[in-house]
């Protein structure tokens, strides 16, 4: 229910009496999901203000709609944890990889 969402907007410092025309920046949905207003426009942290830890299950990575700096393509990957390995799944072609890890002491 969108009426139960918490919405963050910015107004460029002017006093306003209505939300009309004030751009939405972020939304915390009533189901607990935190979403940017527009895809690929917001950062979580910055180069000088970083989050200490991120606790997640699988890690979804995609730069769809943009290209990388190395070969100009885009990707969509998932990193998953196994008991003794880390796995990388290419969500575009279905190929699966294991990270080659070297134990250090």
Task: Enumerate the predicted regions with their spans.
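Beta-strand-rich receptor-binding modules of extracellular spikes/adhesins
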Residues: 1-54, 76-105
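Extracellular/surface-exposed low-complexity repeats and stalk/linker segments enriched in Gly/Pro
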Residues: 57-74
